[in-house]
């Protein structure tokens, strides 16, 4: 079965998670715990699910995006006895009903991506929140929502911001998104990147990864930003930086990666050249103003799989993957080796919650640094890389304020 083959391929290259899985089989740290998950249901995620099951957990899972599930992987999970409610192409009601089904499993620990599951536990399904010992959140967008909830004092349980771990955002967000977003654009369009003007909206870790990889493929990259420091970084990194109003006039391919809404609006679309391509690498489909495109269009059609052509009368523009995550809808998401670290963090976060939930407050926490650094060490070991250690004299030097000129 294709789904099982995909999972086995991912397992082969997820060596850090594999080591943790071996440890979990012996220790069974999640024995007696139910884990409710909303993640992109594809092969790498399935390896995490298997790891949690080997740790003793009961698992219920659904997708965190209506379009990102790979049905053959979801089928493989169900065939393995996992309560999996995900399917590709859900409408909004089906999507939320699947989330409700996960919550009805009465999870002790929640693993979320985008915070939709956690949000439901603070709304219509809040009666189930009492049983939740803690949660972890995978992505920047979700952490932004959760920190807002913490500020307002409404969080009902502690949350570990796995996204904020160094071994997550420095690698997953930058190298993972950088490669997979470009992969999604290329798979959807079959067009050449070299010589194109690629406009990257946002210069956070995701945006800088996309900009880096687009330049590496020969594109001329323009960055748009609202943050002065990030804009200055982009300039110093050698990219052109300008307002979206100006970039709209020259761009061939636009990729949004901001975690905010209305980045590409009607006034920008009107300025674009014929054949402009719009793609989104942010979690939700709100970065490109799709309702504006629908209003402006005289006609629309499917030009290719994952490519919608909008005829605006004087020109055509192309929207990829319905404005959803282009890397997961039109491609396979992040590279396996990158998700090895991200999901190692998730597995360790679940264990940490199981062992420490009684000590944690209703706050958003970073993953403990010792776990973060352990993942880095394990990754280096899996790659055959050795590094130096500080000598005793060096340790003393770094801690002694008396040492000077």
From Swiss-Prot:
Cofactor(s), by name: NAD(+)
Catalytic activity reported: S-adenosyl-L-homocysteine + H2O = L-homocysteine + adenosine
EC number(s) per entry: 3.13.2.1
Pathway linked to the protein: Amino-acid biosynthesis; L-homocysteine biosynthesis; L-homocysteine from S-adenosyl-L-homocysteine: step 1/1
UniProt cofactor note: Binds 1 NAD(+) per subunit.
Gene Ontology biological-process entries: L-homocysteine biosynthetic process; one-carbon metabolic process; S-adenosylmethionine cycle
Enzyme class name: hydrolase
Molecular function per GO: adenosylhomocysteinase activity
Keywords: Cytoplasm, Hydrolase, NAD, One-carbon metabolism
Binding site for substrate: 113, 138, 168, 172
Gene3D superfamilies from the UniProt entry: Adenosylhomocysteinase-like, NAD(P)-binding Rossmann-like Domain
SUPFAM superfamilies linked to this entry: Formate/glycerate dehydrogenase catalytic domain-like, NAD(P)-binding Rossmann-fold domains
Pfam families: AdoHcyase, AdoHcyase_NAD
A single Gene Ontology CC term: cytosol
Binding site for NAD(+): 139-141, 173, 202-207, 225, 260, 281-283, 327
Family stated for the protein in its record: Belongs to the adenosylhomocysteinase family.
UniProt-listed HAMAP family: AdoHcyase
Biological role stated in the UniProt entry: May play a key role in the regulation of the intracellular concentration of adenosylhomocysteine.
Protein name as catalogued: Adenosylhomocysteinase
Gene: ahcY
